[in-house]
Design a protein with these regions (language model features):
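Transmembrane beta-barrel wall of Gram-negative outer-membrane proteins
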Residues: 241, 247-268, 281-320, 344-373
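Gram-negative outer-membrane beta-barrel transporters
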Residues: 496-498, 603-605, 624-707
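Periplasmic N-terminal accessory/gating domains of Gram-negative outer-membrane beta-barrel systems
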Residues: 85, 92, 98, 121-175, ...
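Short, acidic Ser/Thr/Gly-rich low-complexity loop/linker segments typical of extracellular
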Residues: 54-64
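Short, acidic, small-residue-rich periplasmic hinge/interaction motif at the N-terminus
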Residues: 34-39, 46-51, 80-85, 94-138, ...
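Face-selective signature of the C-terminal outer-membrane beta-barrel domain
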Residues: 298-313, 343-515, 598-601, 649
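Membrane-embedded beta-barrel scaffold of Gram-negative outer-membrane proteins
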Residues: 366-372, 571-625, 630, 754-759
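C-terminal beta-signal and adjacent terminal beta-strands/loops
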Residues: 699-706, 731-800
Length: 800
């Protein structure tokens, strides 16, 4: 009897226990709450997950989260976000609903007086470019942002006088630039770095720099190579700066409140001293000026109104006198002398404006209406005579004697007006973005240019029965067309037991009424960070990228009796590039300093290409889709605090690009640069924050080149490598960031910096292009056009 009672009791207990276990496994628990930082501000997109499961969520704009998960005896909830410390909370047998409010401290480390923060994980091809030491950086071209970009992986430059750059085998025209989400443009007639003037990007107004060398998102428009995405400041309070140097001056002023922000900036640039180091001597008188403003007003949380304006004037006057160039080898050294008569006078006036109106339905959904207008007026006029002598150095016997006359009367007016709307919707783990744009282009061009050469009394090219010019071109054309664009993309983030996944996918649809062309461009990027090693991230990007021809790509020519006429082709098509980019990123620490190593292997399948030649920074297109090719390479970059508290990086790129023109054999493209290395290094003196130093180093292997006005098959030569090191040193005369100075003139300033730059510190004679000399036997000599030599610049910066 007792045994029976015991068995019954034990059986009842076992049954109740089994029922409890079954009920426990089936029971759900709702986990919700909010994640904030140490300033009590919500942390958007913070990750909340239950360790060892697939349960989790991503915080919304308010830092709030909510998800449902199966309950357990013990649950470990992990809270994480890039740039913040990770926190874990343990829940013991939770039931029904649990509210968890967690604060994540900022991730920082103290090394003396220097604060070192963690490096953000990169889950897309868009890289955030550090601009901390840009104001201490020596820069000859005046384009401080672009000079930083040339030190990024996959980017190269061959002229310190120009702010243009090549990306992974693409031309200058294949790089798009956005300011506050609006695409901006460059002048079209520029043929040399001396003419280029100021970059449209004002470094004083920049808050953020994003750059992608390929595989970029669908929201970025119709360019094949790269995207530079600039965000201008919205200031709170009052700030400003005034700077002056031997190369120009600038002023910046910004003030704002919680609802209103306004910035104004002016720049003046003159490169007279720098151009004086060129081998062509004469009277250089370049004068560049621009004014920019950016204003933002938010009367309430629902509405935001933004206005941006740019006025830029660029006047270039040049009266050459003489030139002496020695070139060749030590065993075969030649000397080229020219005496000039005549002058050049160019004007490039640019106007740009944009208006944006944003309506926030709530913190998760918004719509923005955009209008922008761009207008350029360009004039290029020159009449230059030259008498030249070519002989062996130290020998009076002449290899070639002659004269030449270059003439141009070129005028171009262009305008681009766009109207568009963009929107975004945020969900728990999705970020949907979309937009539509109508763009209207109008270009009017009148160009007349020719070149005559005479060698020993004979006009070249020599003919017994008539007189010919080396080059004669006339172009009177107008273009008016409309573009229609639509894009949609989504970014999906999720946490799994094996790691975190970020997927960006989208597409563009475009229509161009010039040639009735409709294009579809799908794109996708996926990034995976394994849970076993959150310092490692793998990325893969692919997509179809079209480049709709702008005015220069549309021009074709016909030649009759040595007279060339330019016309616009109606059957021109968009060039196409299919990107495949496989990359990885690894974050690590050395002596408690953060570093990041990135590597990207890429292949670009190119079709419907419009071949071109490059002379200095001028790109001359064939005018037809007669080529196909490829670009393949490997880019590597190590970024981090080589010196505590400063950002430095070293990038190396290996690349090859070829094309087949009209089905012929493969030839190197004009941008076929096999090796490129760039260094940006910043430093300071120990135990003081008064001294700052930056070093920029560039090495780029030589590009293909050949005789002018000839086919690409004749470009069988290679330029010498481009090698340059620039040094910038700054000393802080006054430090008043904490406003501890209350009396005297010093109280008006936060900092006063005195700087010295040494451009081309190694004094290397780099070659930018070649001037070809022909004798009566039609033998040609390539005379190098050297760039600037060593030059010292002094600058003074007042910050208030």
């Amino acid at each position: 009897m007792i045994r029976h009672i015991i068995y019954k009791y034990i059986s009842t207990i076992l049954l109740l226990w089994l029922l409890g276990v079954a009920c426990g496994h089936a029971q759900k628990v709702v986990i919700k709450g909010k994640v904030i930082d140490d300033q009590k501000s919500p942390i958007e997109l913070a990750q909340v997950r239950v360790e060892g499961t697939g349960c989790g969520a991503v915080c919304n704009l308010k830092g709030e989260f909510r998800f449902t998960c199966e309950s357990a005896d013990s649950m470990v909830v992990v809270f994480s976000m890039l740039g913040y410390e990770t926190r874990k909370r343990v829940l013991e047998n939770p039931v029904d609903s649990v509210t968890m409010n967690v604060m994540l401290p900022s991730l920082g480390y103290e090394l003396g007086a220097v604060e070192v923060t963690d490096i953000r994980r990169q889950t897309s091809t868009m890289t955030d470019v550090s601009m901390e030491d840009m104001k201490h950086m020596g820069n000859a071209s005046g384009g401080g942002v672009e000079r930083l970009i040339t030190s990024q992986a996959g980017v190269s430059t061959h002229s310190e006088l120009s702010s243009q750059y090549n990306v992974r085998g693409g031309s200058f025209d294949e790089n798009s630039v956005y300011i506050n989400g609006i695409e901006v443009y460059r002048p079209l007639l520029i043929r040399s770095g001396q003419q280029e003037g100021l970059s449209i990007i004002n470094p004083d107004m920049v808050e953020r720099i994003g750059f992608s060398a390929g595989g970029f998102e669908a929201k970025y428009g119709e360019k094949m190579s790269s995207v530079l995405d600039i965000t201008y400041k919205k200031v709170k309070g009052f700030e400003g700066s005034v700077s002056a140097s031997l190369l120009g001056a600038s002023g910046y002023l910004g003030f704002g409140t919680e609802k209103c922000s306004m910035t104004h900036a002016v720049r003046y640039k003159t490169m007279k001293n720098l151009l004086g180091t060129l081998q062509t001597k004469g009277e250089y008188d370049p004068r560049d000026f621009d004014y920019q403003t950016y204003m933002s007003w938010s009367p309430n949380q629902r509405w935001t109104f933004d206005v941006m304006g740019v006025i830029s004037t660029n006047d270039y006057k040049f009266k050459p006198t003489d030139r002496t160039t020695k070139f060749g080898t030590a065993e075969d050294l030649k000397e080229f002398k020219v005496y000039f008569d005549g002058s050049e006078q160019d004007r490039f006036y640019t106007y740009f404006g944009a208006v944006s109106v944003t309506h926030n339905f709530n913190k998760m959904n918004s719509l923005t209406f955009n209008w922008s207008g761009f207008k350029t007026k360009e004039r290029e006029t020159y009449d230059i005579n030259g008498e030249y002598w070519l002989n062996n150095d130290g020998d009076d016997e002449s290899l070639g004697i002659g004269t030449y006359h270059e003439h141009a009367r070129n005028r171009l007016n262009a305008s681009v007006t766009s109207v568009g709307i963009t929107g975004q919707n945020r969900f728990t783990s999705h970020w949907l973005r979309y937009g539509a744009l109508m763009k209207m282009e109008k270009v009017d061009e009148t160009m007349r240019e020719w070149e005559m050469r005479d060698s020993a009394g004979y006009s070249l090219p020599h003919s017994a029965d008539h007189l010919d010019l080396v080059y004669n071109m006339v172009s009177v054309n107008s273009e008016k067309s409309n573009h229609y664009e639509f894009y949609i993309q989504d970014t999906w983030r999720n946490e799994f037991e094996d790691g975190s996944l970020v997927l960006n996918y989208g597409a563009r649809l475009t229509r161009w009424n010039w040639n009735k062309e409709t294009l579809f461009s799908p794109r996708a990027t996926v990034a995976f960070t394994p849970a076993k090693n959150e310092n490692l991230t793998y990325r893969f990007s692919t997509g179809v990228y079209y480049q709709t021809p702008f005015y220069k790509e549309m021009r074709d020519t016909t030649t009759v009796n040595n007279n060339t006429t330019a016309f616009l082709r109606k059957d021109i098509k968009s060039q196409r590039s299919i990107h495949f980019v496989l990359g990885m990123e690894y974050k690590f620490r050395v002596n408690e300093r953060p570093f990041k190593f990135t590597a990207e292997a890429y292949y670009k399948a190119l079709s419907n290409l419009i071949p071109y030649n490059i002379d200095n920074v001028r790109v001359v297109y064939y005018g037809g889709n007669i080529s196909k090719g490829y670009a393949a390479g490997l880019d590597m970059k190590i970024y981090g605090e080589f010196v505590p508290g400063t950002d430095s990086w070293l990038s190396v790129g290996i690349m090859k690009t070829e094309e087949k023109i009209d089905g012929g054999k493969s030839v190197p493209r004009p941008t076929d640069q096999r090796l490129n290395c760039a260094l940006f290094f910043s430093d300071y003196f120990p135990n003081t924050d008064r001294w700052k130093m930056t070093i920029q180093g560039h090495y780029a292997s030589g590009l293909p080149f050949g005789p002018p006005h000839s086919g690409r098959e004749k470009q069988v030569f290679r330029m010498s490598s481009y090698r340059r090191v620039d040094l910038g040193i700054s000393y802080r005369l006054l430090k008043n960031e904490d406003r501890h100075i209350y009396t005297g003139v010093g109280r008006a300033f936060r900092n006063i910096w005195l700087g010295v730059d040494v451009f081309n510190i190694l004094d290397i004679s780099n070659v930018n292009s070649y001037y070809w000399v022909t004798d009566i036997t039609n033998h040609q000599y390539a005379v190098p056009n050297y760039l600037t030599r060593r030059q010292i610049n002094a600058r003074l910066l007042f910050e208030f």
